[in-house]
C-alpha cells in the first residue's frame, strides 16, 4: 500500500520522466491576483501562462499544489467534518501543457499512471467526456479501449470548464473510481450520482476555445491542458478506504487530536476530523504569510481557527491545544513542504495567541447561546442572537451555523442581515467622527502627549465614546473612542496621519487603534475593542505601532526637505497648500503658476537627496512664536499656533514650525523619490513621493520595466529610448504604406464587387460584407458608385463584437432612395442605428451575427423604395 508521500512522488516522477518540469507548490496567497482570496486549484500559478500574458522556459509542467477552499466563491468550510471528501486544505496533483501536447497524450498519460504506475484495476475506472467532444470519446473508446459500459457523455454543467465568463475554456474528461456495488450510489450522470460509490479522482481540462463577451467560441491558437487530481482522494482509493480522513495524512493528526481530548486514537468523531483538517489549512496559511485579522484573508484564517477551537471545546479540551498539532503536521508534511518546519515556531505562536484570545469569550458566547436555545420555540436561531455572538463574542456566522446544524436548527439570516445593516449605519456615522465626534458631546479635558521620545506608555481612561455619545464602558466588538490622560499616540494634525497600535488592559483585553484624532485638547484613540471590557478610570498600556510610526517619520522629514527645495528651485512664492504624510507615501500641494519642467523636478529631487546624504541632525527647539519667526522659521498660512511653538531645523536648509514626528538625522530617510507631479486646482500643483525602502523598491521596479522594454525592442537599457524612437518612426512609415495598400485593396474590391451587382429596375444594387475599416469601406463605396453609375451600395464589416455599415446612393437616385433611410433600416436589424446624407450614410450595430441577414434584405428594401413588386 502506497503512502500519500509515495503517491505524490510517483506522480511527479512519472511526469518528469515524460518531459515535464516539476514546479514547486506556489504559496496559498496568489501573487498579483486580487480576484482570488487563496490559491484554490493547481492551475492558479499558471493562470497568466494560459492567458498568454506570461512566458516560461517550459511547455510541460507538473506540480503538487497546496490549495485552500474557504471563503469567496469556492468555500468548502461548512461541509468539513460532515462529508468524506470535503477539506479546507488539500493538495492538487496536476500536469499541464502550454501549447505542447493535447487530448491524446493527456488521456494516455492519465490512464497509464492510474492503471500501471498506481495499479488501479481498469474495470474499476469510469470515464466521462463532454457530450459534444467526439475527439476525446474516440480516444477513450477506440485507442485506450475503455469499456463502453463504463463510459458516459455529460453536459456542460459538469464537463465544460471556463476560467471566467470570457476567455479560455474547453471540454473536460473526468475519471471516476468505482468502490463497488456494496457502496450506495450510481454512475456519473445518473439520478444516484451523488452517492459515494463513484468518486471523481481526476479531471482533464482541454482548453481549446476562447469565449467572447457574446458567448461565441473561437479556437485558441495554442490549445492547453490543465489537469487536477486531489491527492487525498487518490490516496483514499489506493489505501482502500472510503473517507479521506482515513488516509495516512490524517491518521497521525486525528490520533494527536484524540490524545489531547483523551479519546481513543481510532475514534470516528466529526470534531476530530474538523480539527485535523483545519490545522492543515491554518498552518499553511500562516506559513504563506497570512495572519489572523478582522477582514480579508486574515478573517478567513480567524474563522477556521475559531471553528477548530470550538470543536476542541466540544470534545472537552479545556486548555489551548490547537498549536500542539503543528508538530505532527510538520512531521507528516515537512518533507514535501520544507517551508512549514522553517516557520513552525511562528505558526505555533500565532495559533496559541489566537486561541487564547478566543477562549476568553468562547465560554461566555456559548452560555448566551444555550440560554437563547432554552427559550427557543421554533427551529430557527434569531438573527439578533447570531449577530450578538458575532459582534460581541467573536463567533463567525459559520461557527454558529455549525452549532445549529448539530442540533437540526437553522439561522434567521434575514434578521442577522438587518442587524448588520444597522451596524453599517452606525459605521457611517463614525465616518463623520473625525470632523465632529458626537454632536453635542465634546471632550472637555486634556491629554498629555509623551510620544516624541517613546512609543509605549501607560495612561488612565478619561473618557469613552460610542456612537458619538459619552459612555462609561466599552464591550467586546464595539467601535468607539478612548481618551487617556497621557498617550504616546500622535493625533492627526499638520497633514500627518494619526498613529495606529493597541491599548491593553492589565487583564489582556485589547483595543485595536486604527486612528488617533484630536478631540479638543485630548487625543482620541479610534478603534474597536477586540474582547472583554474597558471602563472609564481603567489604566491601559498604550503601544504605538513602531513600523508605521517610523515610516511616517521618514515621509514627514522628507516633506520638509521637499518644501525647502521647491522654494529654492521654483522661487520663494511657493507656499504649502496642503499635505498628507502617511506611512506609505507623502503628498505635497503647493502654490505655483505652471507645471515644473522635467529639469526642475530632477533638480528638486537631487537637492532633497543631497540633504539626505549630508545626514543633518534634526534640531528641535521650543520657543516663543515671535522669536521663531524672527529666526527664519516658516509658518504655514492659515495654521493656528500658540504662544509657544516647536521649531524643527535641518541645518540652515530647512526651518519650520512643526509638531509632527521626525527622524533624528536626514540620513535616516535613505532615499526620496518623486513619483508624480500634476495640477489639482488653478495655481496649485501636487507632488507625490516615496522614501526609504519604498523608494528603493520603486526604483527597482522602474529599472525592471526599463530592462523589459529594452529586451522587447532588442536594445541595451542605455539605448532603449533611441531604439523605441526608431521603431516609432518605422511604424509611422508602415502605417503610411498600409494606408496606400488599403486604397489599392479598396480599388480592387470595388472592381470585384461591381461584377456582383444586381439590376433592380435599372438601378445596380450591391450589398456585401467587406472586411475593412471605415475609411476603406467609404473608399470602396466611392469606387463602386463611379463604376456602376446609377447605383445603391451597402457594405458591412465586423470589428470585434461591433458592426460597421456604409451606404452610398448615386445622386440620380436620391429622389427615390435615401442613403440615410436605407442604412437606418439595415442597422436596426443588427441592433444599431445611424444616418447621414441622401447620397452617403453610416451606421453601427451590436449584433454581428445578424449582419448577413441584414445585408440580404437590401435588395428587398430597394424594391420597396422603387415601388416594384
Curated annotation (Swiss-Prot):
It is an enzyme of class 6 (ligase). Its main location: cytoplasm. Keywords: Aminoacyl-tRNA synthetase, ATP-binding, Cytoplasm, Ligase, Metal-binding, Nucleotide-binding, Protein biosynthesis, RNA-binding, tRNA-binding, Zinc. Binds 1 zinc ion per subunit. The keyword RNA-binding applies. Its cofactor is Zn(2+). It is found in: Cytoplasm. GO terms for molecular function: alanine-tRNA ligase activity; aminoacyl-tRNA deacylase activity; ATP binding; tRNA binding; zinc ion binding. GO terms for cellular component: cytosol. Gene3D superfamilies: 2.40.30.130, 3.10.310.40, 3.30.54.20, 6.10.250.550, Bira Bifunctional Protein, Domain 2, Threonyl-trna Synthetase, Chain A, domain 2. GO terms for biological process: alanyl-tRNA aminoacylation; negative regulation of DNA-templated transcription. Zn(2+) binds at residues 556, 560, 658, 662. It catalyses: tRNA(Ala) + L-alanine + ATP = L-alanyl-tRNA(Ala) + AMP + diphosphate. CDD domains: AlaRS_core. Its EC number is 6.1.1.7. InterPro entries: aa-tRNA-synth_II/BPL/LPL, Ala-tRNA-lgiase_IIc, Ala-tRNA-ligase_IIc_anticod-bd, Ala-tRNA-synth_IIc_core, Ala-tRNA-synth_IIc_N, Ala-tRNA_ligase, Ala_tRNA_ligase_euk/bac, DHHA1_dom. Pfam families: DHHA1, tRNA-synt_2c, tRNA_SAD. Catalyzes the attachment of alanine to tRNA(Ala) in a two-step reaction: alanine is first activated by ATP to form Ala-AMP and then transferred to the acceptor end of tRNA(Ala). Also edits incorrectly charged Ser-tRNA(Ala) and Gly-tRNA(Ala) via its editing domain. HAMAP family: Ala_tRNA_synth_B. Consists of three domains; the N-terminal catalytic domain, the editing domain and the C-terminal C-Ala domain. The editing domain removes incorrectly charged amino acids, while the C-Ala domain, along with tRNA(Ala), serves as a bridge to cooperatively bring together the editing and aminoacylation centers thus stimulating deacylation of misacylated tRNAs. Belongs to the class-II aminoacyl-tRNA synthetase family. This is Alanine--tRNA ligase. The lineage of its organism: Bacteria, Pseudomonadati, Pseudomonadota, Gammaproteobacteria, Chromatiales. The gene is alaS.
Amino acid at each position: 500500500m502506497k503512502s500519500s508521500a509515495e503517491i505524490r512522488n510517483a506522480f511527479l516522477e512519472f511526469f518528469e520522466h515524460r518531459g515535464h518540469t516539476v514546479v514547486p507548490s506556489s504559496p496559498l496567497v496568489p501573487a498579483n491576483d486580487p480576484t482570488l482570496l487563496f490559491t484554490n486549484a493547481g492551475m492558479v500559478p499558471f493562470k497568466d501562462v494560459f492567458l498568454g500574458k506570461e512566458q516560461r522556459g517550459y511547455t510541460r509542467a507538473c506540480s503538487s499544489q497546496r490549495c485552500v477552499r474557504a471563503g469567496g466563491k469556492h468555500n468548502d468550510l461548512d461541509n468539513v467534518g460532515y462529508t468524506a471528501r470535503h477539506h479546507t486544505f488539500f493538495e492538487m496533483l496536476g500536469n499541464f501543457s502550454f501549447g505542447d501536447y493535447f487530448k491524446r497524450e493527456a488521456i494516455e498519460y492519465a490512464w497509464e499512471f492510474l492503471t500501471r504506475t498506481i495499479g488501479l484495476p481498469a474495470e474499476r475506472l469510469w470515464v466521462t467526456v463532454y457530450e459534444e467532444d467526439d475527439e476525446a470519446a474516440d480516444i477513450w473508446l477506440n485507442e485506450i479501449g475503455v469499456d463502453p459500459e463504463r463510459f458516459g457523455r455529460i453536459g456542460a454543467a459538469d464537463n465544460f470548464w471556463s476560467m471566467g465568463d470570457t476567455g479560455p475554456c474547453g471540454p473536460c474528461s473526468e475519471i471516476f473510481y468505482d468502490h463497488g456495488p456494496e457502496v450506495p450510489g450510481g454512475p456519473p450522470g445518473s439520478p444516484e450520482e451523488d452517492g459515494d460509490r463513484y468518486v471523481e479522482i481526476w479531471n482533464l481540462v482541454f482548453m481549446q476555445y476562447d469565449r467572447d463577451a457574446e458567448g461565441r467560441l473561437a479556437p485558441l491558437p495554442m490549445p492547453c491542458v490543465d489537469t487536477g487530481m486531489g491527492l487525498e482522494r487518490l490516496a483514499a482509493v489506493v489505501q482502500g478506504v472510503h473517507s479521506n480522513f482515513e488516509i495516512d495524512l490524517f491518521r497521525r493528526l486525528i490520533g494527536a487530536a484524540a490524545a489531547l481530548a483523551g479519546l481513543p486514537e481510532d475514534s470516528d468523531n466529526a470534531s476530530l476530523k474538523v480539527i485535523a483538517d483545519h490545522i492543515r489549512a491554518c498552518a499553511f496559511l500562516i506559513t504563506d504569510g497570512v495572519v489572523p485579522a478582522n477582514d480579508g484573508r486574515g478573517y478567513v484564517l480567524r474563522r477556521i481557527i475559531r471553528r477548530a477551537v470550538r470543536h476542541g471545546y466540544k470534545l472537552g479540551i479545556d486548555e489551548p491545544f490547537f498549536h500542539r498539532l503543528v508538530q505532527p503536521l510538520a512531521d507528516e508534511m515537512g518533507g514535501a513542504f520544507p517551508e512549514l518546519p522553517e516557520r513552525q515556531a511562528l505558526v505555533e505562536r500565532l495559533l496559541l495567541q489566537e486561541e487564547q484570545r478566543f477562549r476568553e469569550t468562547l465560554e461566555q458566547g456559548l452560555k448566551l447561546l444555550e440560554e437563547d436555545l432554552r427559550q427557543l420555540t421554533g427551529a430557527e436561531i434569531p438573527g439578533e442572537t447570531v449577530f450578538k455572538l458575532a459582534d460581541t463574542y467573536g463567533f463567525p456566522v459559520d461557527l454558529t451555523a455549525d452549532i445549529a446544524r448539530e442540533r437540526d436548527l437553522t439561522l434567521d439570516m434575514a434578521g442577522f442581515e438587518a442587524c448588520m445593516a444597522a451596524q453599517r449605519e452606525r459605521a457611517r456615522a463614525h465616518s463623520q467622527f473625525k470632523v465632529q465626534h458626537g454632536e453635542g458631546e465634546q471632550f472637555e479635558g486634556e491629554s498629555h502627549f509623551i510620544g516624541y521620545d517613546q512609543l509605549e506608555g501607560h495612561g488612565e481612561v478619561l473618557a469613552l465614546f460610542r456612537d458619538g455619545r459619552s459612555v462609561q464602558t466599552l464591550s467586546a466588538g464595539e467601535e468607539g473612542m478612548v481618551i487617556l490622560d497621557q498617550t504616546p499616540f500622535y493625533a492627526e494634525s499638520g497633514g500627518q496621519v494619526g498613529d495606529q497600535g493597541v491599548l491593553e488592559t492589565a487583564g489582556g483585553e485589547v483595543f485595536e487603534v486604527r486612528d488617533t484624532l484630536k478631540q479638543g485638547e485630548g487625543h482620541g484613540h479610534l478603534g474597536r475593542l477586540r474582547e472583554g471590557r474597558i471602563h472609564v478610570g481603567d489604566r491601559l498600556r498604550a503601544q504605538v505601532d513602531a513600523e508605521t510610526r517610523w515610516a511616517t517619520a521618514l515621509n514627514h522629514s522628507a516633506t520638509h526637505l521637499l518644501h525647502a527645495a521647491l522654494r529654492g528651485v521654483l522661487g520663494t512664492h511657493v507656499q504649502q497648500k496642503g499635505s498628507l504624510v502617511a506611512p506609505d507615501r507623502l503628498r505635497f500641494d503647493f502654490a505655483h503658476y505652471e507645471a515644473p519642467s522635467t529639469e526642475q523636478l530632477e533638480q528638486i529631487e537631487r537637492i532633497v537627496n543631497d540633504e539626505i546624504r549630508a545626514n543633518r541632525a534634526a534640531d528641535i527647539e521650543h520657543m516663543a512664536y515671535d522669536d521663531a519667526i524672527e529666526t527664519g522659521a516658516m509658518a504655514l498660512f492659515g495654521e493656528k499656533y500658540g504662544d509657544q511653538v516647536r521649531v524643527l531645523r535641518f541645518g540652515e536648509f530647512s526651518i519650520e514650525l512643526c509638531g509632527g514626528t521626525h527622524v533624528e538625522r536626514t540620513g535616516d530617510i535613505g532615499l526620496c523619490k518623486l513619483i508624480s507631479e500634476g495640477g489639482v486646482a488653478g495655481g496649485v500643483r501636487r507632488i507625490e513621493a516615496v522614501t526609504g525602502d519604498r523608494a528603493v523598491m520603486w526604483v527597482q521596479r522602474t529599472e525592471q520595466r526599463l530592462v523589459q522594454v529594452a529586451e522587447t525592442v532588442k536594445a541595451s537599457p542605455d539605448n532603449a529610448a533611441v531604439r523605441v524612437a526608431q521603431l516609432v518612426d518605422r511604424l509611422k512609415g508602415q502605417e503610411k504604406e498600409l494606408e496606400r495598400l488599403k486604397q489599392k485593396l479598396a480599388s480592387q474590391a470595388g472592381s470585384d464587387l461591381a461584377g456582383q451587382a444586381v439590376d433592380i429596375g435599372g438601378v445596380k444594387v450591391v450589398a456585401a460584407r467587406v472586411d475593412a475599416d471605415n475609411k476603406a469601406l467609404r473608399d470602396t463605396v466611392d469606387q463602386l458608385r463611379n463604376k456602376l453609375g446609377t447605383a445603391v451600395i451597402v457594405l458591412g464589416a465586423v470589428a470585434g463584437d461591433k458592426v460597421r455599415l456604409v451606404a452610398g446612393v448615386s445622386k440620380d437616385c436620391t429622389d427615390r432612395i435615401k442613403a440615410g433611410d436605407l442604412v437606418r433600416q439595415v442597422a436596426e436589424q443588427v441592433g444599431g442605428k445611424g444616418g447621414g446624407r441622401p447620397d452617403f450614410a453610416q451606421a453601427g450595430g451590436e449584433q454581428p451575427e445578424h449582419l448577413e441577414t441584414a445585408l440580404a434584405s437590401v435588395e428587398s428594401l430597394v424594391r420597396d423604395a422603387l415601388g416594384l413588386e
